[in-house]
Amino acid sequence: MNKKLFEVYLVLLIILSTPLYAKSPIKVACIGNSITFGTGTENPQTESYPAQLQQLLGHNYIVGNFGKPGATLLKRGHRPYTLQPEYQKAMNFAGDIAVIHLGINDTDPRDWPNYR
């Protein structure tokens, strides 16, 4: 099984294993960079992966999109996610489940000046 397909199955397994009999909707916080935000799609509001996840999960879930284009996982990166407004919004959302997709922008040479 390729890695991407495994990741999708893992996320769905975690989300779907949450009890469906909960009294209030289960909140899923999608935290990440431009991929989470939906950059490159015609309409991130409907075509980003968090929007697609909301459609798949239905009304028993509330999926929040807290993607920030260019965000890094590194605290000393060129755009640390924890210093972005989306981070605080994600914390205030207080999701029951978090899907984190960060790290792509951490390969930026600005964040590794001593690497040769």
Annotated model-derived regions:
Residues 25-29, 35-116:
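Conserved SGNH/GDSL esterase-like catalytic core that processes O-acyl groups on lipids
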Residues 20-24:
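Boundary at the C-terminal end of the N-terminal hydrophobic targeting segment
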Residues 8-17:
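Bacterial N-terminal signal peptides
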Residues 17-18, 48:
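A short hydrophobic/aromatic micro-motif that marks alpha-helical segments and, especially, helix-coil
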Residues 1-9:
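Bacterial N-terminal signal peptides that target proteins for export
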